[in-house]
Amino acid sequence: MSDRLTLLRPDDWHIHLRDGAVLPHTVADVARTFGRAIIMPNLVPPVRNAQQADAYRQRILAARPAGSRFEPLMVLYLTDQTTPEDIRTAKASGFVHAAKLYPAGATTNSDSGVTSIDKIFPALEAMAEVGMLLLVHGEVTRGEIDVFDREKVFIDEHLRRVVERFPTLKVVFEHITTGDAVQFVNEASANVAATITAHHLLYNRNHMLVGGIRPHFYCLPILKRNTHQVALLDAATSGSGKFFLGTDSAPHAQHAKENACGCAGCYTAYAAIELYAEAFEQRNALDKLEGFASLHGPAFYGLPANQDTITLVRDEWTAPTSLPFGELTVIPLRAGETLRWRLEEHA
């Protein structure tokens, strides 16, 4: 087994960078490894149009480390009021690559999200016409639905209908967490794909709940049982172009996580590819990591793969116990624990 692994530079097809004083920290972490990233638009207020997307993009570019060529790929936040013209203008910009469906109340800063999917059908029709991708947070939010069942119910009640109604629309089912989602994506047309996070590959709900509640494992969609984790590992390491890397790295300040009502999100960007390497190594599938991390995503988005490379070295190191987050701190996933792979830094 080799102690070095060289890959075409990967991309992150789902990340939260936040805004303001934290950007120099979050952008540096993602730019260290990834050539491009799909930037989530759930700011306050959200990124609803091309003008707001461009302003956010400029703030991200300004926060890049010196010499960085990292490219943010921008996303619109769909609301009940999103118009076909909003979509066409965003597509024409050249820097907006997708629009995101957040069911209202499903996750962090989703209060402005879609209250009924029927209300965005005109926008979805325009997206299909111009070739803009739909990114989906696939959970229902009704109070009577168990939090562990929200993804499956969303598939049955909404996602099947969208895919059937708009067969030419490219859809990314983001951060899938269940065997049900894997099956749906595998059985759907070539226009349907999914991202999978490192934390959903490495962990299940026992890690979060057994022996005490561990708030830094709390994310949405929530970690599921081990059988679903196994299904995700099967999908990620299958070699199928329908599955690719999306960290859903989502930082919150330490006090907002370690709280009686803590926020959802795991911060993984500081060591994302290293964490994925651990998951793939567990399956003796390191030969499949480059496809998942560097090739499948660009192919689905219709973009070229990166041409430069990164190298991972089998070399244990200890994750930091905390990281700067503006004037506050963020506790990364695996804080203070040993990681088995290290990204080789080039001078």
UniProtKB/Swiss-Prot annotation:
It catalyses: (S)-dihydroorotate + H2O = N-carbamoyl-L-aspartate + H(+). The active site is at D248. InterPro entries: Amidohydro-rel, DHOdimr, Dihydroorotase_CS, Metal_Hydrolase. It is an enzyme of class 3 (hydrolase). Its EC number is 3.5.2.3. GO terms for molecular function: dihydroorotase activity; zinc ion binding. GO terms for biological process: 'de novo' pyrimidine nucleobase biosynthetic process; 'de novo' UMP biosynthetic process. NCBIfam families: pyrC_dimer (TIGR00856). SUPFAM superfamilies: Metallo-dependent hydrolases. It comes from Pseudomonas syringae pv. tomato (strain ATCC BAA-871 / DC3000). This is Dihydroorotase. Substrate binds at H16, L17, R18, N42, H137, L220, H252, A264. PANTHER family: DIHYDROOROTASE (PTHR43137:SF1). Homodimer. Binds 2 Zn(2+) ions per subunit. The modification N6-carboxylysine is found at K100. Belongs to the metallo-dependent hydrolases superfamily. DHOase family. Class II DHOase subfamily. Keywords: Hydrolase, Metal-binding, Pyrimidine biosynthesis, Zinc.
